[in-house]
Amino acid sequence: MLLAIDVGNTNTVVGVFDGDDLADSWRVRTDPHATADELVLLYRGLLGEHRITGVSICSTVPAALRELRRMVVRAFRDLPVVIVEPGTRTGVPILIDNPKEAGADRIMNTLAAHHLYGGPAIVVDFGTSTNLDVVSARGEFIGGVLAPGIEIALDALASRAAQLRKVELTPPRSVIGKSTVEALQSGMIYGVAGQVDGLVRRIRAELGAHATAIATGGLASLVVKESETLDRHEPHLTLIGLRLVFEKNI
């Protein structure tokens, strides 16, 4: 079984693949201060009886990746390990001004999106930030859009506006909020859906083609039903990319 680990700024998504099938998955809080010893205990607890035969990792948090490397050496020392970083074979041409700026998670999303749906495609990743990653018909990463994520936007409002506070992220009864809570929920959910729809339409117009729009990320389920442009919802797109990149390198 392959252990796939996607370390994000807020959460780490962990998956176990049995061949092509995702057998199990977990979402845990990313702790950049966790030691290798603490990570060994965490992963042993998660994995239980799963017999791991390989490990594939991507990370957007350098501090967390350092300790994760040490954990892998301790817990999986004799197994093949792929860490997505500059020089790793991904099969994804990166056609932006500075390819080193492209996050490993964005490249994994590009790889998985083209594998599953072909191209052109737009991956909309709802996480700490809301990322729109654009995939060409040939599977190239050609750039995209970065915007504040839903929770970051809500945190900013709650911290800077004296009479506003954090609210539960659930759809309100209507777009027109009947209370401060509902108005905030409407702005977060319908506002982000409208933002994404506008960006997807602009990207499609720039491409001159109907690119398949694929939603992923921990907050995608909040927006998918309210969007007019998202075609697919693949919650574990990054993990699928990690499986594919492992196969390319081992």
From Swiss-Prot:
Molecular functions per Gene Ontology: ATP binding; metal ion binding; pantothenate kinase activity
Chain's role: Catalyzes the phosphorylation of pantothenate (Pan), the first step in CoA biosynthesis.
CC per GO annotation: cytoplasm
CDD domains referenced in this protein's UniProt entry, alphabetically: ASKHA_NBD_PanK-III (cd24015)
Binding site for K(+): 125
Name of the protein: Type III pantothenate kinase
GO biological process, one term: coenzyme A biosynthetic process
Quaternary assembly: Homodimer.
Pfam families with a match to the protein in the record: Pan_kinase (PF03309)
Reaction(s) catalysed (UniProt annotation): (R)-pantothenate + ATP = (R)-4'-phosphopantothenate + ADP + H(+)
Pathway in which the depicted protein is active: Cofactor biosynthesis; coenzyme A biosynthesis; CoA from (R)-pantothenate: step 1/5
Alphabetical UniProt keywords: ATP-binding, Coenzyme A biosynthesis, Cytoplasm, Kinase, Metal-binding, Nucleotide-binding, Potassium, Transferase
Manner of cofactor binding, per the entry note: A monovalent cation. Ammonium or potassium.
Localization per record: Cytoplasm
Catalytic residues, chain numbering: 105 (proton acceptor)
Annotated binding of ATP, by residue: 6-13, 128
Family assignment from sequence similarity: Belongs to the type III pantothenate kinase family.
Transmembrane segments: none
Enzyme Commission numbers on file: 2.7.1.33
Major localisation: cytoplasm
Organism domain of life: Bacteria
Co-factor requirement: NH4(+); K(+)
Residues noted as binding substrate in the record, renumbered to the chain: 103-106, 180
